[in-house]
Amino acid sequence: MLGAIAYTGNKQSLLPELKSHFPKYNRFVDLFCGGLSVSLNVNGPVLANDIQEPIIEMYKRLINVSWDDVLKVIKQYKLSKTSKEEFLKLREDYNKTRDPLLLYVLHFHGFSNMIRINDKGNFTTPFGKRTINKNSEKQYNHFKQNCDKIIFSSLHFKDVKILDGDFVYVDPPYLITVADYNKFWSEDEEKDLLNLLDSLNDRGIKFGQSNVLEHHGKENTLLKEWSKKYNVKHLNKKYVFNIYHSKEKNGTDEVYIFN
């Protein structure tokens, strides 16, 4: 079950098990949609939200972009696994223009396919000695075949309007892990999210949360205590890639918490 892009911690390997716990719904709300590995692979209609506006704008642009358009940019910049200077030129041009198509092409050539955006909105991922492959076009085609059911938004999770009949799926940054995209997530943000989920439960709205209770010796005591009010399913998975190449293969208690 492919996403639109490679994305740290994506749920494509876990999704079959997760979907077995999803309820019936009028609309699927993916509150932290990331690489779309969930949004693209559930029944619509879907609201795919992520606070990272450049990524959401990239998805919106991709709806009207052909694969030939992607190849034209790669040819124009003479990009390959060894074209570091050409990659840096493309990165410079994206940071000047904020053209979402350039961001999409950049991510194929950046380190671990990561999209790092700094506080100024600039793409900062270094060259990754990589380029497109067969899976790149496969992901693109999967996106194009499944994007019609999706409405995109780039709001803070507290600002998304949740309707009666929605099912709200959340896969937030994890408080106790060290991935790059978790660095702006604080205990206050965690509390705000848990309070939001409690309020949804009070309204009779179904939710499900992917998270980790323990990771490499750390414990999310806040989440563990909160989860006692709900159903907790313990999961086992292997991430698509581990950018920190941790030698610890065990010690992560990944869970799905739902009402």
Swiss-Prot record:
The keyword Glycoprotein does not apply. Changing P126S: In damh; hypermethylating mutant. Its EC number is 2.1.1.72. GO terms for molecular function: DNA-methyltransferase activity; S-adenosyl-L-methionine binding; sequence-specific DNA binding; site-specific DNA-methyltransferase (adenine-specific) activity. Optimum pH is 7.0-8.5. It catalyses: a 2'-deoxyadenosine in DNA + S-adenosyl-L-methionine = an N(6)-methyl-2'-deoxyadenosine in DNA + S-adenosyl-L-homocysteine + H(+). GO terms for biological process: DNA replication; DNA restriction-modification system; methylation; mismatch repair; symbiont-mediated evasion of host restriction-modification system; symbiont-mediated suppression of host innate immune response. S-adenosyl-L-methionine binds at Y7, K11, F32, C33, G34, G35, L36, S37, D50, H156, F157, D171, Y181. InterPro entries: Ade_MeTrfase_dom_2, DNA_methylase_N6_adenine_CS, M_m6A_EcoRV, MeTrfase_D12, SAM-dependent_MTases_sf. Pfam families: MethyltransfD12. Keywords: DNA replication, DNA-binding, Host-virus interaction, Inhibition of host innate immune response by virus, Methyltransferase, Restriction-modification system evasion by virus, S-adenosyl-L-methionine, Transferase, Viral immunoevasion. Changing F127V: No longer methylates hmC-DNA-containing DNA. It comes from the Viruses. Also acts on 5-hydroxymethylcytosine (hmC)-containing DNA, the normal base in this virus. May prevent degradation of viral DNA by the host restriction-modification antiviral defense system. Monomer. Belongs to the N(4)/N(6)-methyltransferase family. This is DNA adenine methylase. It comes from Enterobacteria phage T4 (Bacteriophage T4).
